[in-house]
């Protein structure tokens, strides 16, 4: 299935049914009074996050989603039936924006998360509500209220622990194939990857993490060149970025350091928070470098790139260095999760009784 990560839709909730102005007409009941029922509520439009869906392609073509109107009220105290709700199933990781104001309405990050996109209109009142001691035969009724109507923009940001970042043909697809169950298209020309790929990396019976391989970036990606905006946003939810660098480009005129600096520059221009995200350097295609030149080439790259963070030397093609890389990632993610759990379990200082001079028996100290 083709990966679609943005769509625009219109959601229209159902209108409420009109109330009825009816009088009871029955044999032997000369003054039956009002018996007009209320109109039914209009159907609402809901969204629910579904982990079994991974693309917005259905909403690229089905742009208008309408819920049913409520039925009108009738005589004999018959209330109109409510309009049926409709539910739009969206991938986990979908952000929902108002297309007219660009305001974010919701971010569906949990499977089963549910949200009302457009609420149905309330049904109108029948004339039974207007009966009083001075108005025994009311003719008043109210019409149903219109349902909400919204233009929405759906934006999918993939949920992954690790994001692969790099120039086209840096070997990112080969790397995700080597370490995970993903099988993206691989070829010896740039821009082979045209949409994000997700792969699950298993490091033990109950340990795993998710890697996202986005299409290669080019200079100007932060301004949208090469669909850069669509690709960079998929890295925003990751915990760590792997900057994959081709250390043995076919074109000798290409400088890996200059390309790596260009990628970092695009990150900084696109989003400061993304730029500050933990980033590891992965020097790839070492199998293409003569063995006696590898150490010197690696040191030269690190020196000119002025890199002080973690460095991993690998060959995605031969899998050399890949086991060490994935176990280092798993250890890092485990440490992050342990710190988050410890922070969540820490007692709130505002609830510490010693700060308020309260004894354990509940009495206050002098």
Swiss-Prot record:
Stored HAMAP family: GTPase_Obg (MF_01454)
Name of the protein described by the UniProt record: GTPase Obg
Region (Disordered): 128-147, 344-366
Family annotation (NCBIfam families): Obg_CgtA (TIGR02729), PRK12296.1 (NF008954), PRK12297.1 (NF008955), PRK12299.1 (NF008956)
MF terms in GO: GTP binding; GTPase activity; magnesium ion binding
Localization terms from the record: Cytoplasm
Chain positions recorded as Mg(2+) binding sites: 173, 193
One GO term describing the cellular component: cytoplasm
Enzyme type, top EC level: hydrolase
GO biological process annotation, one example: ribosome biogenesis
Biased composition (Basic and acidic residues): 349-366
Family under the similarity heading: Belongs to the TRAFAC class OBG-HflX-like GTPase superfamily. OBG GTPase family.
PANTHER family, A to Z: DEVELOPMENTALLY REGULATED GTP-BINDING PROTEIN-RELATED, MITOCHONDRIAL RIBOSOME-ASSOCIATED GTPASE 2
Protein purpose: An essential GTPase which binds GTP, GDP and possibly (p)ppGpp with moderate affinity, with high nucleotide exchange rates and a fairly low GTP hydrolysis rate. Plays a role in control of the cell cycle, stress response, ribosome biogenesis and in those bacteria that undergo differentiation, in morphogenesis control.
Gene3D superfamilies listed in its UniProt record: GTP1/OBG domain, P-loop containing nucleotide triphosphate hydrolases
Database matches in Pfam families: GTP1_OBG (PF01018), MMR_HSR1 (PF01926)
Cofactor(s) needed: Mg(2+)
Taxonomy, superkingdom: Bacteria
Keyword annotations of the record: Cytoplasm, GTP-binding, Hydrolase, Magnesium, Metal-binding, Nucleotide-binding
EC number: 3.6.5.-
Binding annotation for GTP: 166-173, 191-195, 213-216, 284-287, 315-317
Subunit structure: Monomer.
Residues of the Obg domain: 1-159
């Amino acid at each position: 299935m083709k990966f679609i990560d943005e769509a625009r839709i219109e959601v229209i909730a159902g209108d409420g049914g009109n109330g009825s102005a009816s009088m009871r007409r029955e044999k032997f009941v000369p003054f039956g009074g009002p018996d007009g029922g209320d109109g039914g509520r209009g159907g609402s439009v809901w969204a629910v996050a579904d982990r079994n869906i991974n693309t917005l392609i259905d909403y690229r073509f089905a742009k208008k989603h309408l819920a049913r109107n409520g039925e009108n009220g009738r005589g004999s105290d018959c209330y109109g039936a409510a309009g049926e709700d409709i539910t739009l199933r969206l991938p986990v990781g979908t952000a929902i924006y108002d297309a007219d104001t660009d305001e974010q309405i919701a971010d569906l990050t949990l499977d089963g998360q549910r949200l009302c996109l457009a609420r149905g209109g309330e049904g109108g009142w029948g004339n039974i509500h207007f009966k009083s001691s001075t108005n025994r035969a009311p003719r008043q009724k109210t019409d149903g209220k219109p349902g909400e109507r919204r233009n929405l923009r759906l934006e999918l940001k993939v949920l992954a622990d690790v994001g692969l970042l790099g120039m086209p043909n840096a070997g990112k697809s080969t790397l995700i194939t080597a370490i995970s169950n993903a099988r993206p298209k691989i070829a010896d020309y740039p821009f082979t990857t045209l949409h994000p790929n997700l792969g699950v990396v298993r490091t033990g019976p109950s340990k795993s993490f998710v890697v996202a391989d986005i299409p290669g970036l080019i200079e100007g990606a932060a301004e949208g060149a090469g669909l850069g905006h669509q690709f960079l946003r998929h890295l925003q939810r990751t915990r760590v970025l792997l900057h994959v660098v081709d250390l043995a480009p076919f074109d000798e005129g290409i400088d890996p350091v200059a390309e790596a600096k260009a990628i970092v520059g695009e990150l900084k221009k696109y989003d400061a928070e993304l730029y500050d995200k933990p980033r590891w350097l992965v020097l790839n295609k070492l199998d293409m470098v003569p063995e006696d030149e590898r150490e010197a080439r690696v040191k030269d790259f690190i020196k000119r790139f002025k890199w002080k963070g973690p460095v991993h030397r690998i060959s995605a093609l031969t899998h050399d260095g890949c086991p060490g890389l994935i176990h280092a990632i798993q250890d890092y993610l485990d440490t992050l999760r342990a710190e988050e759990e410890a922070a969540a379990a820490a007692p709130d200082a505002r609830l510490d009784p010693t700060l308020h001079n309260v004894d354990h028996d509940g009495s206050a100290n002098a």
